[in-house]
């Protein structure tokens, strides 16, 4: 599958379910709050899974593709169990391997705003 369609399919799966099927075993995961690269599929499934569980909707605002790499600006509508909602823009940098598996993701977003949201502020 070409990389653009692959990324679009992944983001559709974030909305509808099944995103886990895209993730390779050998995976690198980076976040804006750390220089550390987390390694392994399970680490990503846990971290992204907690975030995606709050997501009511993901809208891809911009998508740039070069080879097997993708840069996306996405808007997530998040909701806490209390009903409180937040729209959060997230820059996501993805890399797919030749077998169409997601092998790397680095994300950037306003962590302060997200933490306040999680604290119910």
Locate the predicted segments by residue.
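Short beta-strand edge/turn micro-motifs at domain boundaries
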Residues: 93-118
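A solvent-exposed, acidic/Ser-Thr-rich amphipathic alpha-helical stretch
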Residues: 5, 16-68
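A short hydrophobic beta-strand element
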Residues: 67-76, 88
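Short beta-strand segments enriched in hydrophobic/aromatic residues
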Residues: 76-78, 109
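Short, low-complexity N-terminal intrinsically disordered segments enriched in polar/charged residues
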Residues: 1-17, 21, 120-121
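Short, cysteine-centered beta-strand-loop-beta hairpins and adjacent loop/turn segments enriched
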Residues: 53, 78-87
